[in-house]
Amino acid sequence: MAILFKEVCDIFYKIESTTKRLEKMEYFIELIKMVENKKAPQDLKKICQIAVGRVFAEHENKELGIGPNILIDAIISTGINKKTIQNTINQTGDIGTALEQLGHNIKQTSLFQTPPTLEEVYTTLKKLSTIEGGQSQKKKIRHISSILIKSSPIEQRYLARLILEDMRIGMSIPTILGAFSKYYNQPKENLEKIYAVVNDIGLLAEKLAQRCDIYNDEELQLKIFRPIKPMLAQLIGSINDAIIEMGAPQFETKYDGARVQIHKKDNIVKIYSRKLEDITNSIPEIVEEVKNIEAQNLIIEGECVAMDKNGRPRPFQDILRRFRRKYNIDSIQSEINLKVYVFDILYYNNKSLIELPLIERRSILEKILTNKHNKLNISHKLTTDNEQKAREFYEWSLSIGHEGVMIKNPNAIYTPGSRVRTMYKFKPTLESLDVVITKAKMGMGKRKEWYGSFEIAVKDYENNLYTIGHVGSGLTEEELHNLTEQIKNITIEVINDEAIVEPKIVLEISYEEIQESDKYKCGYALRFPRVARIRTDKSIEDINSIEDIERIFDIQKGKGNL
């Protein structure tokens, strides 16, 4: 039996109406029960993805790519006056809420219009991502307006948000996994492990709804060409702290580059960025080297570094130039030389290795990679419990132009997508922060034509955003121009020269210190923040958390983090 989109939206409204995580879980369980009652296990996949503002699975690295301007044009095409919709958006601060309030003004094509099903909405939105070429914008507007016309105000509320991929109901992957754990009577930590490997909440949901054996189902195992989120490190206050905690850690050079995940099956190679983008065609020289590795199939992880003629790292932006280049690869390849320092192996000859300790994974890696690979090198490492030797290795890593050291527990397994306490990073300066732009204000003087000041935010456990300051320095005029063009495409509303934007642009911020402050809800503020880099290789999921801020604050005050 088909599930109506309105049935889902009614429960989404309940979820949005509470701030309590347990209540959100209980309401989500109502959706699971609806799926079971209607015998529609495939629909739980769609519900889960929609709940977190996605039409596609994370590993697919696809977006609808519809900005507020196209959505507003689609709304206008249904019969709502442009000034009316703009004023209502300004009053509510949300296109979805504004559309719900004005939904009665939409011209209905028929009094007997059939309400859209969940499947119909999902299929219509997936089509949007395939529309390209001439007249594509008009075609997208026509598709969006066709589904809006069939929808009730509550459906329009969530349709608008889903089109912008920002549902604002406070659902996160951990909350969904909590609901699964309770309803299907499965340990949450087991579900977290499976999700980390498949990187697809919809697939896991569908398998649970089908009552599959989730522990032995082949589709729920680590697979070649289905990238996973990388394991992330925490910050530590000193080398000695790490030795006290781990005994004899494995120290590795922290390279000044971009993380890559390399998949190989027979003679086919795919390389993914940290955001899980397929960058294979942009770095052909690395692809050719990977083909020469003697392995039937594998997944390895490393840091891609741009090198100058003296063997020292070039600026980070040069790597992004290579990753973004789609055409004339040969010319930029000769200009920007790349090398990948491989530090982990996750899969080898049809076997997942992520449950093996690091010391065993490293041993396998060292047998596979040899010095004959010019563009692929194993990361420099030192395993020791001697602080002086570790300090010398750290100083050497800095002397060759890199950022510091990674400190890893040799007995630790690989935990995809988690910021773990078995891997730390140690650098000579305070850790920079990855934040997302939430508002932008026009500049002054010669920069008055561009957005020049940005409100920036970090996240909490549930991925809610919290402002931590404003930043305006550190950007070139070219970067300001490019940012302004990007912001125009993701602007939700503009009030007094300040644009409220979709949280999609990630900045790396340096600062003098983190201060306690009651100015912002998170309780902290940045002193003298400055943009270090525009991180096009990162998404909102990669930004720092309030927990990270607290840890850095403790370290700068000499309290440590252990």
From Swiss-Prot:
PROSITE patterns associated with the record: DNA_LIGASE_A1, DNA_LIGASE_A2, DNA_LIGASE_A3
CDD domains (UniProt xref): Adenylation_DNA_ligase_Arch_LigB (cd07901)
Pfam families associated with the record: DNA_ligase_A_C (PF04679), DNA_ligase_A_M (PF01068), DNA_ligase_A_N (PF04675)
Disulfide bond entries: none
Known catalytic reactions: ATP + (deoxyribonucleotide)n-3'-hydroxyl + 5'-phospho-(deoxyribonucleotide)m = (deoxyribonucleotide)n+m + AMP + diphosphate
Record NCBIfam families: dnl1
Protein name: DNA ligase
